Amino acid sequence: MENQAHNTMGTSPCEAELQELMEQIDIMVSNKKMDWERKMRALETRLDLRDQELANAQTCLDQKGQEVGLLRQKLDSLEKCNLAMTQNYEGQLQSLKAQFSKLTNNFEKLRLHQMKQNKVPRKELPHLKEEIPFELSNLNQKLEEFRAKSREWDKQEILYQTHLISLDAQQKLLSEKCNQFQKQAQSYQTQLNGKKQCLEDSSSEIPRLICDPDPNCEINERDEFIIEKLKSAVNEIALSRNKLQDENQKLLQELKMYQRQCQAMEAGLSEVKSELQSRDDLLRIIEMERLQLHRELLKIGECQNAQGNKTRLESSYLPSIKEPERKIKELFSVMQDQPNHEKELNKIRSQLQQVEEYHNSEQERMRNEISDLTEELHQKEITIATVTKKAALLEKQLKMELEIKEKMLAKQKVSDMKYKAVRTENTHLKGMMGDLDPGEYMSMDFTNREQSRHTSINKLQYENERLRNDLAKLHVNGKSTWTNQNTYEETGRYAYQSQIKVEQNEERLSHDCEPNRSTMPPLPPSTFQAKEMTSPLVSDDDVFPLSPPDMSFPASLAAQHFLLEEEKRAKELEKLLNTHIDELQRHTEFTLNKYSKLKQNRHI
């Protein structure tokens, strides 16, 4: 009865402790699941935001590519128009040169003819009066043709002015785009500063988490949480670095595009200058054409005078002189308008000089901005390199700490197994002591019984001392990872008390058996040896008994059944935790592969 009560008293605190441990484990697992779910949601939201940012950046790039294509088309069209204009002007120049050469020859002939006519007397004036209207009509037609040409040139001048206005508008748009890019660069700098602050916060949280132990959670779970946090921080740093590199490349490409556009604008300005020079040349050519018209008039008069007789030439000499004088007056009036054209040309030249000065100042400003951006890029690369080095050092330190903790866990598991083996031995020894009746106990060989008892007691003492030493070492080192260390000490004390009670029972039995030694004959030692062979003692390597106990001891059976159920639950919990950890690792690998593919697509 005393042994049964002692067994019930021994199993009840163990059951309570195990139930408390199971409840704590369930609470910890539920808390861990909630934390993981929150982290996964936060990661999903971040991924969605990053995807949206990538889509926005892609749309911006597409828009900029379309703008570049439109600008290229405009440049091609302008080049084609300029080529066509130059070809037309060259053809007109060649035709005007040919006409000028003809007019010079005719003028020389007219001059010689007039010199001859001055020597000859004037006669037959009425015949020439009939031919004068015909000559005047021809001259009027030629004047109208030249006026039409002057109108066309005026229209071309208006077109060139509109083209200059459009170029000014394009320059304004380019300046606005440069300002927008500066604002974007400032926003990127603010984002970088925010990320640096986040990194500093994470770096300050890491030693705090390492130094402050949480009594409600296990050390392995805390270490896994810290490792996952560091991995996420390293991934965010790598992603931010790649983003910054891509954005810097985009900015450099856009700056190159703007430099090309500036060069194209310079080429357009040079073309406008050449067009203005060609316009000056055209004005000069117009003046030459007017002179040529005058010479043609003189030539026509020579031809008509040559066809007629000398008398008719003498009579028509006076009116033919009056008409060229009138034409000369008209030409002088046209020459008076020439200073106005020169003033307009001077104004256009001054405007072009102002545009060139403004363009040069903008180029210098853009160069200064490019140099500033390059310096900022170098500084950012240096900071990123330092952050990566710090992250690598932290990863190494965490790996070393994890290895040390895994070794300590392995040692502690071995000590737990040994403690369980000793506890099962103690329970089976109690069962054996209760199973032996006083009559049978007196009939056994006393010497064999004492030897087996002493060997079992010595073994239990040795195992208990070894377990105590292991627990003392773990307590001194201060690196235990389980929160229920006090339970091990209590179980050790309980085992020691049970051992003392077993010794007291054996001493009492020995005192009872001493007066009956002389009366009872010694029996052969086969009975006790058979009993020893069937006894459920546990070896040093096994955790559970080799043979089940007798049905007459329900307390030992209940304890064994309870231990088996607890082991099954522990194994199931381990399996669940391992499966959950594997799922998390697969998910992280999937996300990493996804982002690596996105990075590769960006680089392509």
UniProtKB/Swiss-Prot annotation:
Name of the featured protein: Deuterosome assembly protein 1
Q: Spell out the note in the miscellaneous section.
A: CEP63 and DEUP1 paralogs are both involved in centriole amplification: while CEP63 mediates mother-centriole-dependent centriole duplication, DEUP1 mediates de novo centriole amplification in multiciliated cells.
Q: Name one GO biological process term.
A: centriole replication
Q: Which domain of life is it from?
A: Eukaryota
Function of the protein = Key structural component of the deuterosome, a structure that promotes de novo centriole amplification in multiciliated cells. Deuterosome-mediated centriole amplification occurs in terminally differentiated multiciliated cells and can generate more than 100 centrioles. Probably sufficient for the specification and formation of the deuterosome inner core. Interacts with CEP152 and recruits PLK4 to activate centriole biogenesis.
Provide the organism lineage as a comma list: Eukaryota, Metazoa, Chordata, Craniata, Vertebrata
**Gene name, please?**
DEUP1
What does the UniProt keyword field contain? Cilium biogenesis/degradation, Coiled coil, Cytoplasm, Phosphoprotein
Q: For the modification Phosphoserine, which residues carry it?
A: S547
Tell me the compartments it is located in. Answer: Cytoplasm
Its subunit composition reads: Interacts with CEP152; the interaction is mutually exclusive with CEP63.
Q: Which family does it belong to?
A: Belongs to the CEP63 family.
Q: Show the Pfam families listed in the entry.
A: CEP63
Task: Please provide, in alphabetical order, the Gene Ontology terms of the cellular component aspect for this entry.
Answer: centriole; cytoplasm; deuterosome
Q: Where does the UniProt entry say this protein principally localizes?
A: cytoplasm
Organism expressing this protein natively: Homo sapiens (Human)
Q: Under the GO molecular function aspect, what terms does this record hold?
A: identical protein binding
Coiled-coil regions listed:
14-59, 85-197, 226-278, 336-399, 558-601
